Every structure is written in C-alpha cells, then in structure tokens.
Amino acid sequence: MAPSSKSERNSGAGSGGGGPGGAGGKRAAGRRREHVLKQLERVKISGQLSPRLFRKLPPRVCVSLKNIVDEDFLYAGHIFLGFSKCGRYVLSYTSSSGDDDFSFYIYHLYWWEFNVHSKLKLVRQVRLFQDEEIYSDLYLTVCEWPSDASKVIVFGFNTRSANGMLMNMMMMSDENHRDIYVSTVAVPPPGRCAACQDASRAHPGDPNAQCLRHGFMLHTKYQVVYPFPTFQPAFQLKKDQVVLLNTSYSLVACAVSVHSAGDRSFCQILYDHSTCPLAPASPPEPQSPELPPALPSFCPEAAPARSSGSPEPSPAIAKAKEFVADIFRRAKEAKGGVPEEARPALCPGPSGSRCRAHSEPLALCGETAPRDSPPASEAPASEPGYVNYTKLYYVLESGEGTEPEDELEDDKISLPFVVTDLRGRNLRPMRERTAVQGQYLTVEQLTLDFEYVINEVIRHDATWGHQFCSFSDYDIVILEVCPETNQVLINIGLLLLAFPSPTEEGQLRPKTYHTSLKVAWDLNTGIFETVSVGDLTEVKGQTSGSVWSSYRKSCVDMVMKWLVPESSGRYVNRMTNEALHKGCSLKVLADSERYTWIVL
C-alpha cells in the first residue's frame, strides 16, 4: 500500500525495507558517498582540496557578533566585512555624511583583533580615499594579495551618479563616467618593530605613531568610461605587491613597496628589462580555440610578412584610404608635425614598435609597415611608444619648516598618488633616492596605452588590416596573469569601421564590425606580443550593450576553460559590502581555513 502521508513517504524512503522507496534511498545515499569519494580522489589529481566539501560541517568555533562587540559600535553603523587571510583580524567600515545633498561621504576602515575567549579589540582605524569629495554611497571591496600580508587594497566604485540637481550644479560626471577610488593601507603588525618603538617614544600616547612600513596609506582616483571595465581582483592582484588598474584608456601596473635607506636588497619590481634568451625560430602553428595560448616567456621571432596570396585592396578602397590619409597628413604638417619621409624606420616584429620613437604618429587607415627595415639590433634602442614607466620615492619631511624641492611635473599619463602616514602627514615624492634617510615608500607605474596597441596590432598582424578604417570603441578583459614570468594576457574587444571584403558585392562603404585581439604584455620589458587576431564579424542591428555583453560572456567562458587549480593559499581574499547594497545582510563571517564563524 502506498504511504498516506509525506512523513510516511520520507520514512519509507529512508528505511532499509525491500520496497521501491528503500531501494531508492540506498541508491541516493550511495550516490552521495560516491560523490565525496570522487571529490577526494580528485584532490590527488588537482592538488587542491575544495572547501565546498565541508561547507555543511559545523564550524570549530561559532560566536555571535553581539557577544564580542560592544553595542555602541553597532549603533555607530559598523558594517563588518570578514576575516583577514591570517585569521587574526576582523575588518569593518563606517560611512558617514551630512543630512543635506551637498555633504560628502567619509569612509573609515577598522581592524579588530579576534580572540575566541574575549571581545574584539580595536587595533587600527584609518580614513579611506583621503580628502576625496564623494557624493554617493560606494560599493567597497577590500582585497588581500595571495602572499603579501603587509597591506590591503580597498576599491570604491561609484556605480550611480548623484541626483540631477547636484550634478547640474557641481558639473559632475554623467552616466557615461564612473569614479574609481583606491586606497592601499599598511596592515597593523602583530608586534612592534624597532622602528615602531622609536616612533612611539617620539610621540608618546599616540596610537598612530608607527613606522612607515607598518603605517602608510596611499590613495588615488581615476575615472572610467563606457563600457565600464570589468572588476577582476583575482587577476588584478595575482602578482604580489602589484595591482593592475584598467583606466579605460590604459592598463596601469602599480607596485608599492617600503624600503630603508642603505637597503642593499632593493629590487625593482616592474620594468627591470630582464628577458629570457631567444628561442629557436619555428613556423607558427594554428591555435585551437579550445586551448589557451601560451604566454610568451621569451621574445619571439619576427612575424612573417603578409602572404602574397592575400587579396589586394581594390582601386576604389585604395583611393578612399589615400584621400583620408592625405587629409591627416596635411593637418599634421600644418601643425608643424614630422613629414612622412622624415619618420624613422620600424623594426620588424609582431608589434613592430620595439624601436619606435615616442614621437612617431600612429598608422592611419591600414598603412602597412616596411618589411625590409634593418634588424632591431642595428636600430637605435629606445623605449616603445606605447609604454610609460615612472618610479617615485616618497619620504617624510624631516622638519616642519622644510622647503619642498621643485614640484614634479605631471606627465598626464601616470596616476596621481597621495601618500600619508597614519598621523595624516603627507610624504614628499622624489625621483632619486640618493638623499633619502630612514624609510621610504616606492611607487612604480608601468602603463600600456590601449589605443596605440590596437593600432599596432591591426597594422602589423591583422589579415584584414587593408580593410580597416577606424575603431569606435573597445573593451579590455584580463584573461590570465602569470606571476612567475610577469606576463599579462589581455583580450581587446573592438568595434570598428572597415571596408567589406573585395569579394562581397554591393557598394564600397565602410561597415561596423566586431572582433577581438589577444595580446600578452611583459611587465619586465613593457613589450607586448600579439597572440591572436580574430576575424571580423559584422554588427547587424545589435546595440553596443548587447555586443559587449556577449563579448564578456565569451571571455568568462574562455577563462573557465583555461582554469588551472592553484594552491589553496594562493588566492586573493576579497570582502565586499555588496549585501548591504542589495538590502540584506550576511548571515555569518566565515574563516573557512580555521572553521570559525561569527554569526551576525
């Protein structure tokens, strides 16, 4: 007889009887046991133990937030984010603003020392995004590098504009622009070093009296445009001490480190010009779309010239291109630019710009580079025009009345940084560290210009380069970062105007196409290498939003196909206030490595 109630059906399914329910229960239990065994077997293959296996296990320690934090802090509006990677600290933040529409938001970040048998102890409080005028509540993300536990980096995303009246009065950014705020803050040390003790003796009673290594703050702000770059902390922070910032116009690699005067172990992190020896030349093989392109750990040989079998552009296309190029040429000469015949020769290579002078203009409308130029070794060595490198040393002023040195000129390329200590004193930037005494903070910036790279790749490596007219928009997604070889693989989605293939019938008018360019950028040399160039896909009736949406989905699929398991400790710890913006709260703050929960 069939069970008459849900409880009877459940009990029948879970019993060991010989009925169908009992057999089904055995099969289900067997499947569950088999699944766990398969997962554990996979550990031997991948070398990584997935924490998902133990998510339903009770934590070793489970405490309530109300029992370890005074109510005054909760009433003050503390939003608790999570545990640090080391498990020693719990982080929270507060945001405050006035009652009127013209007041700014002010953010503070807090470190609380966690102890199972006592209440949380506040050990550090810092103000984020120093002196920035923030008119709306931010999405915050606090991140830690895989192995660098000396500092955290905080991103603030302004995803919606202020109200219309304030925008009109203050001339703020419109819906096509978003502000990104970044603060890098030193983590409180577990104990006081000798330099911290000296600072405490110099400023008795001041909890913010710390040495520079354990007490610096670095702030910057930049603006991104549509299509707004994807936030990818797992890739942007994959290399310790380095953060990759996509500013919509360039990719900026920033390295932050603290050193002492006379430190012989100083090592430049970026752009140290270290390269591996050249590999023997080999003919290129077709790349399967299912396999990830190998990140070049060496400088490959020059790319072959375009085959003679490629279709030649029709006379109408050539005439139209020459007309456009002539207009640009005349405008350049009218402004006192360099004439066409005075330009230096290009060096052969996939990017064709290793020995390019900074002042050389970009190729226009599909101009091709001369393939009979002299070898790169014979050309004068100069930095590629698509790369900018700066290194500044920040030091604390020695006295209150010290006259600052000459102001450093803004190169309009590097991101501006404000560096302070915990007591709010600004650090002065210097280009040379010869006169530095005591501790100093080094900020390196290596910048890759997207538009220059796009023009170079199309000019030298695109089989459809003879059809190209201009590009209208682009979107950059990081596909992989190799911290050992310092290679960054990026995918450039491109909306462009190009003439149709000569084989197509109809009028010779430019059409809108979409394509993608994969490029590997070397953080040691600043040089990029073209990995692959996609075919042209005509955009028919699609909005730019749908084009970028499908492009980013394809990037996600590509990354998931290439995903390689890493050591459980080599991850970027990420804490956000996303739940707050969704109108809800986290249930627990979990330290999965130590099986500790704080119930909210």
UniProtKB/Swiss-Prot annotation:
Residues 1-30, 280-316 are annotated as: Disordered. The modification Phosphoserine is found at S50, S310, S314. Keywords: Immunity, Metal-binding, Phosphoprotein, Ubl conjugation pathway, Zinc. The keyword Secreted does not apply. Changing W112R: Abolished interaction with DDB1, DDA1 and RBM39 in presence of indisulam. GO terms for molecular function: metal ion binding; small molecule binding. Changing V182D: Decreased interaction with DDB1, DDA1 and RBM39 in presence of indisulam. Zn(2+) binds at C193, C196, C211, H214. GO terms for cellular component: Cul4-RING E3 ubiquitin ligase complex. The gene is DCAF15. It comes from the Eukaryota. It comes from Homo sapiens. The keyword Coiled coil does not apply. Substrate-recognition component of the DCX(DCAF15) complex, a cullin-4-RING E3 ubiquitin-protein ligase complex that mediates ubiquitination and degradation of target proteins. The DCX(DCAF15) complex acts as a regulator of the natural killer (NK) cells effector functions, possibly by mediating ubiquitination and degradation of cohesin subunits SMC1A and SMC3. May play a role in the activation of antigen-presenting cells (APC) and their interaction with NK cells. GO terms for biological process: immune system process; protein polyubiquitination; protein ubiquitination; regulation of natural killer cell activation. The lineage of its organism: Eukaryota, Metazoa, Chordata, Craniata, Vertebrata. Changing Q232R: Decreased interaction with RBM39 in presence of indisulam, without affecting interaction with DDA1 and DDB1. Residues 13-27 have a biased composition (Gly residues). Component of the DCX(DCAF15) complex, also named CLR4(DCAF15) complex, composed of DCAF15, DDB1, cullin-4 (CUL4A or CUL4B), DDA1 and RBX1. InterPro entries: DCAF15, DCAF15_C, DCAF15_WD40. Residues 280-295 have a biased composition (Pro residues). E7820 binds at F231, A234, F235. Aryl sulfonamide anticancer drugs change the substrate specificity of DCAF15 by acting as a molecular glue that promotes binding between DCAF15 and weak affinity interactors, such as RBM39. Pathway: Protein modification; protein ubiquitination. Changing L91P: Abolished interaction with DDB1, DDA1 and RBM39 in presence of indisulam. This is DDB1- and CUL4-associated factor 15.
